[in-house]
Amino acid sequence: MKALSKLKPAEGIWMTDVPEPEVGHNDLLIKIRKTAICGTDVHIYNWDEWSQKTIPVPMVVGHEYVGEVVGIGQEVKGFKIGDRVSGEGHITCGHCRNCRGGRTHLCRNTVGVGVNRPGCFAEYLVIPAFNAFKIPDNISDDLASIFDPFGNAVHTALSFDLVGEDVLVSGAGPIGIMAAAVAKHVGARNVVITDVNEYRLSLARKMGVTRAVNVANESLQDVMNELGMTEGFDVGLEMSGAPPAFRTMLDTMNHGGRIAMLGIPPSDMSIDWNKVIFKGLFIKGIYGREMFETWYKMAALIQSGLDLSPIITHRFTIDDFQKGFDAMRSGQSGKVILSWD
């Protein structure tokens, strides 16, 4: 079958021919319809320091997808041939304390689809049936293919009560923009997103944020004054991993504010801890999606009217995958969809 693989320790992704995966007793075989390119896939393409430490080569990559069930393991119940599914990309052990306690998203033995085991940039994918999520009929293939990153956004945004709150989102990548849209949809008062990429800030405006602020030429404090904010932000969603953005967030949080962090900062990032302590801030790290509460919330948000369509900016056939990666690497894109049909 056709598959996009990391073949060697160098920049690039290559189209390859690999054997179709075998279906285990508890697995589903999924025929891929559409995939989306994640920032993680760009890291793998670029072969940066994280990729060099993490990705065994050769490896079929990719973990954002929608497809159709075409094979079912003999122990699997609850699925049938033809079901349209996406899936949780974190394969968990089922045996550690967190898994046994129902906190599977915190499994210490997590294996990543398209990172540590063969991924979805292929004609067929095998995953445990436990990880598959049936897509409701009124959700499109395009939207279903970005459920993985949308789940990161939903998990982060809904970590805290947002109704009536002023929310600061730092980082207008696709996940940050989707998190801001979720916050607005569920009843936040002001949702302000910051970045220095004007293209992505314009996408955020299309998604309905209160203000999209280019901090290279506009003061966040001035925007807060303009919005009539006198006490700071109640909730911060840190999506950028950029130390200056996080420091600005700490400066502008209200006392007792809550911060959810999805962005990955440098390991040696320094902050003024006095602001955390004396403001009484609560900081929560976010990884992946809650299994499977986040998935149910994703579907419900879209079915209740949340419009994510502006975040999908580019569509290519799989034979034009290089154009898709070029668009993602340029920084002038939202989500990029690759069609396998």
Swiss-Prot record:
The organism's place on the tree of life at top rank? Bacteria
Question: Which positions are annotated as binding Zn(2+) 1?
Answer: C38, H63, E64
InterPro entries in alphabetical order: ADH-like_C, ADH-like_N, ADH_Zn_CS, GroES-like_sf, L-Threonine_3-DHase, NAD(P)-bd_dom_sf, PKS_ER, Zn_alcohol_dh
Residues the record lists as binding NAD(+): I175, D195, R200, L262, G263, I264, I286, Y287
Q: What is its main location?
A: cytoplasm
Alphabetical GO CC annotations of the entry are:
cytoplasm
Could you tell me the EC number(s) of this protein? 1.1.1.103
What are the BP-aspect GO terms?
L-threonine catabolic process to glycine
Q: Which reaction does it catalyse?
A: L-threonine + NAD(+) = (2S)-2-amino-3-oxobutanoate + NADH + H(+)
**Keyword entries, A-Z:** Cytoplasm, Metal-binding, NAD, Oxidoreductase, Zinc
Site feature location: Important for catalytic activity for the proton relay mechanism but does not participate directly in the coordination of zinc atom:
D148
- The protein's annotated pathway: Amino-acid degradation; L-threonine degradation via oxydo-reductase pathway; glycine from L-threonine: step 1/2
Cofactor binding, per record: Binds 2 Zn(2+) ions per subunit.
Broad enzyme group: oxidoreductase
Localization recorded for this chain is: Cytoplasm
Question: In which residues is Zn(2+) 2 bound?
Answer: C93, C96, C99, C107
PROSITE patterns (UniProt xref):
ADH_ZINC
User: Where are the catalytic residues?
Assistant: T40, H43
One GO molecular-function entry: L-threonine 3-dehydrogenase activity
Question: Which cofactor is recorded for it?
Answer: Zn(2+)
**Role noted for this protein:** Catalyzes the NAD(+)-dependent oxidation of L-threonine to 2-amino-3-ketobutyrate.
Description of how the protein assembles with itself and partners: Homotetramer.
Family, similarity comment: Belongs to the zinc-containing alcohol dehydrogenase family.
- What is the name listed in the Swiss-Prot or TrEMBL entry for this protein? L-threonine 3-dehydrogenase
| Species for this entry | Cronobacter sakazakii (strain ATCC BAA-894)
The organism's taxonomy opens as: Bacteria, Pseudomonadati, Pseudomonadota, Gammaproteobacteria, Enterobacterales
- Gene symbol here is tdh
